[in-house]
Amino acid sequence: AHPLVRALWQPRLLEALDWIAAETTERLAAGHRIVWMEEKGELAVQGVVLSGKPDRIDRAPDGTLTIIDYKTGKAPGPKQVAGGYAQQLGLIGLMAEGGAFEGVEGRAACFEYWSLARDQKTDGFGCIVSPVDPSGARGRIRTEDFVETAARNLEAALNRWLLG
C-alpha cells in the first residue's frame, strides 16, 4: 500500500482489531464459545444448494447461537433487512439451524454486525448493531421471526426466479 494510505489507515485498523479482541475476550469470559469461523457450509432448500461462509458463529451460555458478520464499514440498515434486501444473517441462521455447519446445533437467537467503522456514541472504532429487535420496534423484524422470514424470502425468490 502507498505510505500515505498506510499512515492514515493503519492506526484505525489497529484500534478496530483491538476492539474486536476486547469484545471477544469479554464474551468468552461470560461463557460464550466460538463454534464456527470462516468455513463454508451448504444446505439444500427446495433442491437448490444454499452455500455460505459465516464470519463467525458463537454459542451463548444458554445454548442458542449468535450469528456474527464483520463489516469494514456501515452495516445494512433495518429498512434494508426488513425489506428483504439484506438477509445474510437470517440465511446463515437458517443454515446453522438446518445442520449446514458440522457440529453446530441450536437455535439462532442473536444476529449481529460487528462494524469496524467509527462508533458515533463512543467516537472509537468498532460497534455492534443488530438489524432485528426482540419486539419488532422501529420497523425491525422481530428477532425470533428473522430466520423464518429469511427462509420465506428465499423460497419466494427460488420459486420466482429458479423453480417457477
What are these regions (language model features)?
Residues 1-164:
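Structural signature of nuclease core domains in nucleic-acid processing machines
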